[in-house]
């Protein structure tokens, strides 16, 4: 009975969080085009290169999913919720004063729960569905968008998380900085991708990258901070109801579980 009640609580928690985020997506989504790189904006050469670079991480992540997720139904619920978190946050389209739009990435939560490789799998799936169902991003640019948001963003978030964990920074502060920096780094990679493929005629690649970084920074810095705060809030809710599962994933130790 305890197992059934626990699973029911986890399922209810997942539904509540996803419903809350769903309200956000439907109230904000009608604005502009989001800043996944759109269909046809990159040259075929770079589309192929970025796609090839994603493949090793995707293969590694697929193998990790089988090891981590397959044995425990409650961890499967966390896996599904982490994917929904990425889908909904990265589909939010927030207008920018620069004439573009920006969005959160949502990759911090999954990276902390499951690591960067599994987050790559979730990120690629999310980007594929967004391209097919929401015309958000594109099929030809799937590799580039995946490399930025599903590979490099999670790797940076994970690196920050482990470094801050090693020097014993409090968990909430650690999660905030990990999610925030992971979001910002995703946009740095996107700026590099755009700058390489669209160098300025006279000033070259580096000036183009600098221009894209300047365009993104105006809105992406506050968005990244907001994402960091939201990630902390969602993680604390998960920790309250699923501390045993977080312990199995190696995120909480016994003393941290007792505090919750």
Swiss-Prot record:
The keyword Transport applies. Its main location: membrane. Residues 1-34 form the signal peptide. Keywords: Cell membrane, Cobalamin biosynthesis, Cobalt, Cobalt transport, Ion transport, Membrane, Signal, Transmembrane, Transmembrane helix, Transport. It is a multi-pass membrane protein. This is Cobalt transport protein CbiM. Part of the energy-coupling factor (ECF) transporter complex CbiMNOQ involved in cobalt import. The chain crosses the membrane at residues 39-59, 77-97, 109-129, 132-152, 175-195, 215-235. It comes from the Bacteria. One of its GO terms (molecular function) is cobalt ion transmembrane transporter activity. GO terms for cellular component: ATP-binding cassette (ABC) transporter complex. Forms an energy-coupling factor (ECF) transporter complex composed of an ATP-binding protein (A component, CbiO), a transmembrane protein (T component, CbiQ) and 2 possible substrate-capture proteins (S components, CbiM and CbiN) of unknown stoichimetry. Belongs to the CbiM family. One of its GO terms (biological process) is cobalamin biosynthetic process. Pathway: Cofactor biosynthesis; adenosylcobalamin biosynthesis. It is found in: Cell membrane. PANTHER family: COBALT TRANSPORT PROTEIN CBIM, PTHR43627. Gene3D superfamilies: 1.10.1760.20. The keyword Transmembrane helix applies.
């Amino acid at each position: 009975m305890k197992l059934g009640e626990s699973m029911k609580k986890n399922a209810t928690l997942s539904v509540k969080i996803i419903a809350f985020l769903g309200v956000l997506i439907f109230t904000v989504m009608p604005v502009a085009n989001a800043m996944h790189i759109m269909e046809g904006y990159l040259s075929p050469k770079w589309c192929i290169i970025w796609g090839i670079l994603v493949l090793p991480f995707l293969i590694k992540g697929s193998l990790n999913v089988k090891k981590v997720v397959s044995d425990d139904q409650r961890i499967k619920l966390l896996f599904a919720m982490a994917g929904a978190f990425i889908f909904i946050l990265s589909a939010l389209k927030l207008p920018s004063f620069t004439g573009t739009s920006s969005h959160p990435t949502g990759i911090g939560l999954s990276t902390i729960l499951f690591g960067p490789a599994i987050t790559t799998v979730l990120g690629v799936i999310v980007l594929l569905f967004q391209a097919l169902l929401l015309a958000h991003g594109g099929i030809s640019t799937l590799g580039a968008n995946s490399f930025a948001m599903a590979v490099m963003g999670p790797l940076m978030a994970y690196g920050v998380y482990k470094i801050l964990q090693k020097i014993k920074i409090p968990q909430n502060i650690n999660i905030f900085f990990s999610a925030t920096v992971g979001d910002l780094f995703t946009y740095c990679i996107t700026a590099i991708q755009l700058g390489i493929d669209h160098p300025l005629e006279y000033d070259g690649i580096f000036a183009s990258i600098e221009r894209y970084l300047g365009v993104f920074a105006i809105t992406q810095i506050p968005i990244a901070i907001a994402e960091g705060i939201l990630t902390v809030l969602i993680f604390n809710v998960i920790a309250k109801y699923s501390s045993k599962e977080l312990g199995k994933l190696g995120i909480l130790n016994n003393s941290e579980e007792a505090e919750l």
